[in-house]
From Swiss-Prot:
Broad EC category: hydrolase
UniProt-recorded name of the protein: Lysophosphatidylserine lipase ABHD12
Cellular component aspect of the GO annotation: endoplasmic reticulum membrane; membrane
GO molecular function: lysophospholipase activity; monoacylglycerol lipase activity; phospholipase activity
Gene3D superfamilies on file: alpha/beta hydrolase
SUPFAM superfamilies: alpha/beta-Hydrolases (SSF53474)
Spans within the Extracellular topological domain: 96-398
UniProt keywords, alphabetically: Endoplasmic reticulum, Glycoprotein, Hydrolase, Lipid metabolism, Membrane, Transmembrane, Transmembrane helix
Chain intervals with Basic and acidic residues compositional bias: 1-16
Residues in the Cytoplasmic compartment per record: 1-74
UniProt-annotated catalytic positions: S246 (nucleophile), D333 (charge relay system), H372 (charge relay system)
Pfam families reported for this sequence: Abhydrolase_1
Amino acid sequence: MRKRTEPVALEHERRTASGSPSAGPAAAALDADCRLKQNLCLAGPGPAEPRCAADAGMKRALGRRKGLCFRLRKILFFVLGLYVAIPFLIKLCPGIQAKLIFLNFVRVPYFIDLKRPQDQGLNHTCNYYLQPEEDVTIGVWHTVPTVWWKNAQGKDQMWYEDALSSSHPIILYLHGNAGTRGGDHRVELYKVLSSLGYHVVTFDYRGWGDSVGTPSERGMTYDALHVFDWIKVRSGDNPVYIWGHSLGTGVATNLVRRLCERETPPDALILESPFTNIREEAKSHPFSVIYRYFPGFDWFFLDPITSSGIQFANDENVKHISCSLLILHAEDDPVVPFQLGRKLYNIAAPSRSFRDFKVQFIPFHSDLGYRHKYIYKSPELPRILREFLGKSEPGRQH
């Protein structure tokens, strides 16, 4: 290669030096081109190929990086667009907020047969169905005191109904949103209360579990009223207490206010993890964190709740309640902030409606880890209930 190239270059130099007609700009360009070709030929094919391959690899890497950045930008714009669109969607469709508050479509635990409470370890419990209104059917569980569990084996609904007239007090339990009357933490609470000598009657509101109907605040309250009246017809003079948890505290205060207005109050009201009203709870809920400082938060997220007829105004209801009130709240509650429970107590305590009744607030330290739904684990709970409600007397056997 080198021998063939050198004469061409020498001949071109001689022509240029002798002043041939090709001299000038064109000749200079030709000369530069010849020199470049000579250098490439002298260098040989070896070193040039790796440099070209490296350049091609770098171009491919840059292309992939640009493609990744483009895809990330698309994802970012999609998420940002969704973030902005959700408030408008909720404002235009208030029913979405109602579903998020009730969460009745979340049925946990899954695949349990609510007709068989014994599968949940409640072998002294009877399942039945009541009909508060036309086209509405609600599933009910009645757990008798633990001391009766042997006698309860194989008994029918009539036996359980008759048992309500025994000397054991009765707790009507109103659960919170999501899940069913067979939720794990709820079942554990039934067991604790049953072991303390209480009848426990609980049910799924319309639209929850195997209950039929469409959820609403009015409907949930009416379901609770129907079950309370059903109990009172069968309980004689036995004390009947109402226990509400989380969203169930809103149902409980609605119910008790109505009972007090008709002058048939329960013997006591227990509120576990209560809030003041649904607007304040929605604003404090962990789901609202990413939108809490969004411009127009109240207009986008809270006003649709009110327009759907959902208020659960515990702070207003307690001003019209005339029975003993016990509030239980864990300091580490991540769902209903502890401050809302304390605020509700501060509203209720000075109310004139409670001047002849005791109002008590029991906090549970955050170190205990009871959070939103595990107060039933407290070893102090039996003592708290005995002191507040009075020690249960042993009843006659059925």
